[in-house]
Amino acid sequence: MLNFFRLRNGFYVSWRADANSQIEGKVDIRPIQHIYGDWKDIVYFGHEPAAWLARMQTFKIVDFFADEACVGLFHTAAQNPELHYYDFGSDTSPLGVDFQGYLALLAHTLGYRYWQLLLLELEAPTPATRPWHPQRPQTQELVQGLQQYVPGFDLQAFVARYDAVRLPTPA
Protein backbone atom coordinates (compact mmCIF):
# COMPACT_ATOMS: atom_id res chain seq x y z
CA MET A 1 0.00 0.00 0.00
CA LEU A 2 2.79 2.40 0.88
CA ASN A 3 4.48 1.87 -2.50
CA PHE A 4 1.29 2.94 -4.27
CA PHE A 5 1.03 6.11 -2.19
CA ARG A 6 4.70 6.96 -2.75
CA LEU A 7 4.00 6.97 -6.50
CA ARG A 8 0.45 8.28 -6.54
CA ASN A 9 -1.14 9.83 -3.46
CA GLY A 10 -4.74 8.92 -4.24
CA PHE A 11 -6.82 9.41 -7.37
CA TYR A 12 -10.36 10.25 -8.39
CA VAL A 13 -12.25 9.12 -11.49
CA SER A 14 -15.98 9.21 -12.17
CA TRP A 15 -17.89 8.36 -15.31
CA ARG A 16 -21.45 8.05 -16.57
CA ALA A 17 -22.65 6.10 -19.64
CA ASP A 18 -24.46 9.22 -20.88
CA ALA A 19 -25.90 12.41 -19.41
CA ASN A 20 -29.28 10.82 -18.57
CA SER A 21 -27.99 7.45 -17.43
CA GLN A 22 -27.96 5.81 -14.03
CA ILE A 23 -25.08 3.67 -15.33
CA GLU A 24 -22.01 5.12 -13.67
CA GLY A 25 -18.80 4.42 -11.86
CA LYS A 26 -16.58 6.17 -9.39
CA VAL A 27 -13.21 5.55 -7.80
CA ASP A 28 -12.07 7.88 -5.04
CA ILE A 29 -8.88 6.48 -3.55
CA ARG A 30 -8.23 9.00 -0.82
CA PRO A 31 -4.80 10.60 -0.30
CA ILE A 32 -2.93 8.90 2.52
CA GLN A 33 -3.19 11.91 4.85
CA HIS A 34 -7.00 11.71 4.49
CA ILE A 35 -7.13 7.94 4.96
CA TYR A 36 -5.39 8.19 8.30
CA GLY A 37 -7.26 11.32 9.35
CA ASP A 38 -10.33 11.57 11.57
CA TRP A 39 -13.55 10.15 10.07
CA LYS A 40 -15.86 11.50 12.79
CA ASP A 41 -19.23 12.65 11.42
CA ILE A 42 -18.77 10.37 8.40
CA VAL A 43 -17.98 6.88 9.74
CA TYR A 44 -19.14 7.50 13.29
CA PHE A 45 -20.75 10.36 15.21
CA GLY A 46 -19.73 9.81 18.82
CA HIS A 47 -23.08 8.79 20.30
CA GLU A 48 -23.05 5.13 19.24
CA PRO A 49 -22.67 2.21 21.68
CA ALA A 50 -19.17 2.20 23.22
CA ALA A 51 -17.95 -1.09 21.71
CA TRP A 52 -19.11 -0.16 18.20
CA LEU A 53 -17.71 3.35 18.53
CA ALA A 54 -14.30 2.10 19.69
CA ARG A 55 -14.12 -0.25 16.71
CA MET A 56 -15.31 2.28 14.12
CA GLN A 57 -12.91 4.97 15.33
CA THR A 58 -10.16 2.75 13.88
CA PHE A 59 -11.93 2.40 10.49
CA LYS A 60 -10.20 4.40 7.75
CA ILE A 61 -11.82 5.03 4.37
CA VAL A 62 -9.63 4.06 1.42
CA ASP A 63 -12.11 4.25 -1.52
CA PHE A 64 -15.01 6.66 -1.00
CA PHE A 65 -16.82 5.40 -4.11
CA ALA A 66 -20.35 6.51 -3.11
CA ASP A 67 -21.92 9.04 -0.76
CA GLU A 68 -23.46 6.21 1.26
CA ALA A 69 -20.81 3.48 1.06
CA CYS A 70 -17.06 3.01 1.00
CA VAL A 71 -14.21 0.56 1.31
CA GLY A 72 -11.72 0.92 4.14
CA LEU A 73 -9.51 -0.79 6.64
CA PHE A 74 -9.19 -1.04 10.39
CA HIS A 75 -6.03 0.73 11.54
CA THR A 76 -5.17 -1.21 14.68
CA ALA A 77 -2.11 -2.72 16.33
CA ALA A 78 -2.90 -6.02 14.57
CA GLN A 79 -2.12 -4.36 11.20
CA ASN A 80 -4.55 -6.59 9.32
CA PRO A 81 -4.40 -5.47 5.67
CA GLU A 82 -7.87 -6.79 4.76
CA LEU A 83 -10.25 -4.22 3.29
CA HIS A 84 -13.89 -4.00 4.35
CA TYR A 85 -17.05 -2.78 2.64
CA TYR A 86 -19.02 -0.29 4.72
CA ASP A 87 -22.57 0.71 3.84
CA PHE A 88 -23.17 3.65 6.19
CA GLY A 89 -25.78 2.80 8.75
CA SER A 90 -24.97 -0.90 8.86
CA ASP A 91 -21.87 -2.90 9.77
CA THR A 92 -18.67 -3.52 7.86
CA SER A 93 -18.13 -6.67 5.80
CA PRO A 94 -14.73 -8.20 4.94
CA LEU A 95 -13.83 -8.29 1.26
CA GLY A 96 -11.11 -10.93 1.45
CA VAL A 97 -8.50 -8.74 -0.28
CA ASP A 98 -5.83 -6.24 0.64
CA PHE A 99 -5.20 -2.93 -1.15
CA GLN A 100 -3.08 -4.48 -3.90
CA GLY A 101 -5.75 -7.12 -4.59
CA TYR A 102 -8.45 -4.46 -4.54
CA LEU A 103 -6.64 -2.45 -7.22
CA ALA A 104 -6.21 -5.58 -9.36
CA LEU A 105 -9.96 -6.24 -9.22
CA LEU A 106 -10.82 -2.58 -9.71
CA ALA A 107 -9.02 -2.75 -13.06
CA HIS A 108 -11.53 -5.40 -14.22
CA THR A 109 -14.56 -3.26 -13.33
CA LEU A 110 -13.46 0.30 -14.14
CA GLY A 111 -15.09 1.35 -10.88
CA TYR A 112 -18.59 0.36 -12.00
CA ARG A 113 -20.99 1.45 -9.26
CA TYR A 114 -21.07 -1.03 -6.38
CA TRP A 115 -18.80 -3.61 -8.04
CA GLN A 116 -17.60 -4.37 -4.51
CA LEU A 117 -20.83 -6.32 -3.93
CA LEU A 118 -19.34 -9.08 -6.08
CA LEU A 119 -16.61 -9.46 -3.48
CA LEU A 120 -19.14 -9.74 -0.67
CA GLU A 121 -20.76 -12.70 -2.37
CA LEU A 122 -17.42 -14.27 -3.32
CA GLU A 123 -16.19 -13.85 0.28
CA ALA A 124 -19.33 -15.46 1.73
CA PRO A 125 -18.54 -18.10 4.38
CA THR A 126 -19.55 -21.06 2.22
CA PRO A 127 -16.95 -21.85 -0.44
CA ALA A 128 -18.12 -20.88 -3.89
CA THR A 129 -17.96 -23.43 -6.65
CA ARG A 130 -16.25 -22.68 -9.92
CA PRO A 131 -17.41 -21.63 -12.42
CA TRP A 132 -19.12 -19.13 -10.16
CA HIS A 133 -22.45 -17.44 -10.83
CA PRO A 134 -24.01 -14.82 -8.54
CA GLN A 135 -26.96 -15.94 -6.43
CA ARG A 136 -28.33 -12.65 -5.10
CA PRO A 137 -30.63 -10.71 -7.47
CA GLN A 138 -28.72 -7.48 -6.80
CA THR A 139 -25.43 -9.14 -7.71
CA GLN A 140 -26.96 -10.73 -10.83
CA GLU A 141 -28.06 -7.26 -12.00
CA LEU A 142 -24.61 -5.91 -11.23
CA VAL A 143 -22.96 -8.59 -13.39
CA GLN A 144 -25.38 -7.85 -16.26
CA GLY A 145 -24.46 -4.17 -16.05
CA LEU A 146 -20.74 -4.92 -15.96
CA GLN A 147 -21.05 -7.18 -19.01
CA GLN A 148 -23.03 -4.54 -20.87
CA TYR A 149 -21.08 -1.39 -19.98
CA VAL A 150 -17.51 -2.41 -19.13
CA PRO A 151 -15.68 -3.38 -22.32
CA GLY A 152 -14.36 -6.93 -22.17
CA PHE A 153 -15.68 -7.69 -18.68
CA ASP A 154 -15.52 -11.44 -18.14
CA LEU A 155 -17.06 -12.72 -14.91
CA GLN A 156 -14.99 -15.90 -14.75
CA ALA A 157 -11.76 -13.95 -15.38
CA PHE A 158 -12.77 -11.63 -12.53
CA VAL A 159 -13.44 -14.63 -10.26
CA ALA A 160 -10.08 -16.18 -11.21
CA ARG A 161 -8.34 -12.91 -10.40
CA TYR A 162 -10.17 -12.76 -7.07
CA ASP A 163 -9.04 -16.30 -6.28
CA ALA A 164 -5.45 -15.26 -7.12
CA VAL A 165 -5.42 -12.15 -4.90
CA ARG A 166 -7.69 -13.38 -2.11
CA LEU A 167 -6.13 -13.29 1.34
CA PRO A 168 -5.75 -16.63 3.10
CA THR A 169 -8.62 -17.32 5.46
CA PRO A 170 -7.57 -17.64 9.10
CA ALA A 171 -7.53 -21.22 10.35
Where are these regions (language model features)?
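Short, solvent-exposed secondary-structure capping/transition elements
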Residues: 10-14, 114-119
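A surface-exposed partner-binding patch
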Residues: 1-69, 158-171
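Long, low-complexity acidic/proline-rich regions
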Residues: 78-81
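Short, surface-exposed beta-strand/loop micro-motifs that present aromatic residues
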Residues: 69-76
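Compact, glycine/acidic-enriched structural inserts
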Residues: 83-117
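Short amphipathic alpha-helix initiation/capping segments at coil-to-helix junctions
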Residues: 64, 76, 92-95
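Charge-dense, low-complexity intrinsically disordered regions
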Residues: 116, 122-171
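Generic structural signal for hydrophobic core residues of well-folded globular domains
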Residues: 8, 65, 106-109, 122
